[in-house]
Structure formats: C-alpha cells, structure tokens
From Swiss-Prot:
Reactions performed catalytically: adenosine(37) in tRNA + dimethylallyl diphosphate = N(6)-dimethylallyladenosine(37) in tRNA + diphosphate
EC number: 2.5.1.75
Designated name of the protein: tRNA dimethylallyltransferase
Record-linked InterPro entries: Dimethylallyltransferase, IPT, P-loop_NTPase
Organism: Haemophilus influenzae (strain ATCC 51907 / DSM 11121 / KW20 / Rd)
Feature type site, description Interaction with substrate tRNA: T101, R123
Residues in the signal sequence: none
Function summary: Catalyzes the transfer of a dimethylallyl group onto the adenine at position 37 in tRNAs that read codons beginning with uridine, leading to the formation of N6-(dimethylallyl)adenosine (i(6)A).
Subunit: Monomer.
UniProt gene name: miaA
GO molecular function: ATP binding; tRNA dimethylallyltransferase activity
Interaction with substrate tRNA: region residues: 35-38, 159-163, 240-245
Length: 311
C-alpha cells in the first residue's frame, strides 16, 4: 500500500498558506513548499513568503534553499520533494504539498525524462554564434526546431535559448519532446485540492491589494539590495519572478514608478490566469475549495481525507 500525500494547489493570493496552517493544527502533516520563487533566500516580500510567525505554526520545507544567483529545475524539485516526502512518511506523518508552481506538481506526479548535462564545447559554439549574429537570430533558429519552447522564451533570454539549443544538439530531440517523455511515476497515493475564490474579480482585487501591501512592506528596498549585489541580472530565474522583474526594470530606468506598479499587478494577474488554466486542464481529479469560505474549505479537506483514508 502506497503512503498518502496531500496536494494543496491554487493561484497566487488564493489563501493556500492560511489553509495549510489550519490543516497542520488538526492533521499529522508536514508542509513542503511547491513554489519556484520561495526557494530563494533574501526574496521574502515580493514572493509573499510565509512570515516567521506563520512558519512557527507550520514550518515549510524547500523554502530559502538557494541563493538568487542559482538556478533550479523541475527535476531538482522532484528529487528534493521525494526526499522530504520520504522523511515525513518515515516519521509517520503525511506530506502536505502547498504551492502554485504547477510544472513542479506535474513533474512530481508523472516524472521527467532526464535532460543531458551541459556540454561546454556546444555552449561555447553557441556563444560565439550569438556574438556574431545576436541572440535574436538564435531564438529564430530555436523557433524552427522547437516552436513551443521558443514561444515561452524571450528572444533576449540568452541563458534559456542556449540551453534549449544545446539540448537539441546533444540529443537530436527538442526540449519539448524530452520533457513530454514521462519518467518514474510518483510512489504515493495523493489527494488533490485546489483553492481559489469562485469570483475571479475577488482574486484580481486580492492581487492588487497584495502588491500594494508589498510596496508598503519595503519591496523596493528588497530588490534594491539584490540589484546592488552586481552579480545578478534580469535573465536569471530569480529576477524573472513576477514582481521582481518589474521592479528590476524600474530600477534600471526602463519605466516610471506608477508604470512599474501597473505592470507588476498585471503580470501577477497573468500568472494567476496561467495557474488556473493548468488546474482546469489537470488530468487527475481535483476537489475545488472556495477561498471566500475558509472554514468550509478546511472542513471539506478534513472530511474528504477522512473518507479517503477509510477507503
């Protein structure tokens, strides 16, 4: 019999953390974060990282594990999450995975085809080609090989263009083809919940309010500190995080303060829309919860889990 795991998914600003804290007070669970932004140290305000008080009530694994200069893949997450889940299960508890990075959940459930290690010779050739023709030309080349990846990658994002082309030159397969090849399935029985306000206008209002709250809490100073380091740039996954990118571009002088706020809110709403699109197309059953009914949401999870465990 496989051990049980609980997934608590949902768009940004939907109330996942609050519900996770409530669940931990009533269930033998330990929380694992499923969030590609919370992994970074020194990025607290703009990621809406749980506060010290919240973490005291419900410690989260897989937050604050990397410096913003480092990259982290869905494969990295799967390895780390499986290790943490095994540790939690060994303690006789249930892993409660909480977050909105849907690609991480997909990787965890379905497994991933391992991607090849970097080839410095190929990378050097691509760098040389880019120096002569520009990264936009290499992006055009990528679009012919792998239009799906090219559509997701900004033409100026040299790091991701290089990697996508490198993978193709090493394997003869596109990055999209390789990531669609399934690996080892998840060795857990998992119950899935998704929390969101039933009224999308409420979610949009929450996102706007949260962004303004981040500004009040010192988000600009947080990004200024990262900017002043000198070793970070806008092509890094950390700085591409929603909100950070817009504040970074403002600090670079790309646009005015009010424009930065507008763009930050719009980008966060677009993120929420993408997360909801993922969830609506999810292949395995999800129990939906209403953010506006937190007590009912908690009771639904407890009731559903009780009946699930009884079989």
């Amino acid at each position: 019999m496989k051990p049980t795991a609980i997934f608590l998914m949902g768009p940004t600003a939907s109330g996942k953390t609050d519900l996770a804290i409530q669940l931990r007070s009533q269930l033998p669970v330990e929380v694992i974060s499923v969030d590609s932004a919370l992994i970074y140290k020194g990025m607290d305000i703009g990621t809406a990282k749980p506060s010290k008080e919240e973490l005291a009530l419900a410690p989260h694994r897989l937050i604050d594990i990397l410096d913003p200069s480092e990259s982290y893949s869905a494969m990295n997450f799967r390895d780390d999450a499986l290790r943490e889940m095994a540790d939690i299960t060994a303690q006789g508890k249930i892993p409660l995975l909480v977050g909105g990075t849907m690609l991480y959940y997909k990787a965890l459930i379905e497994g991933l085809s391992p991607l090849p290690s970097a080839d410095e010779n190929i990378r050097a050739e691509l760098e040389q080609k880019a120096a002569q023709q520009g990264w936009a030309a290499l992006h055009t080349e990528l679009a012919k090989i792998d239009p799906i990846s090219a559509a997701r990658i900004n033409p100026s994002d040299s790091q991701r263009i290089n990697r996508a082309l490198e993978v193709f030159y090493i394997t003869g397969k596109s990055l999209t083809e390789l990531t669609e090849e399934k690996g080892e399935a998840l060795p857990y029985d998992f119950v899935q919940f998704a929390i969101a306000p039933q009224d999308r206008h409420v979610l949009h209002e929450r996102i706007e309010q949260r962004f303004h709250k981040m500004i009040e809490l010192g988000f600009q100073a947080e990004v200024e500190k990262l900017y002043a380091r000198g070793d970070l740039n806008i092509n890094l996954p950390s700085i591409r995080c929603v909100g950070y990118r817009q504040m970074w571009e403002y600090l670079q002088g790309d646009y005015a303060y009010e424009e930065m706020i507008f763009r930050g809110i719009c980008a966060t709403r677009q993120l929420a829309k993408r997360q909801l699109t993922w969830l609506r197309g999810w292949k395995t059953p999800i129990q939906w919860l209403d953010s506006l009914q937190p007590q009912q949401a908690k009771e639904t999870v407890l009731r559903h889990l009780d009946s699930y465990q009884k079989g």
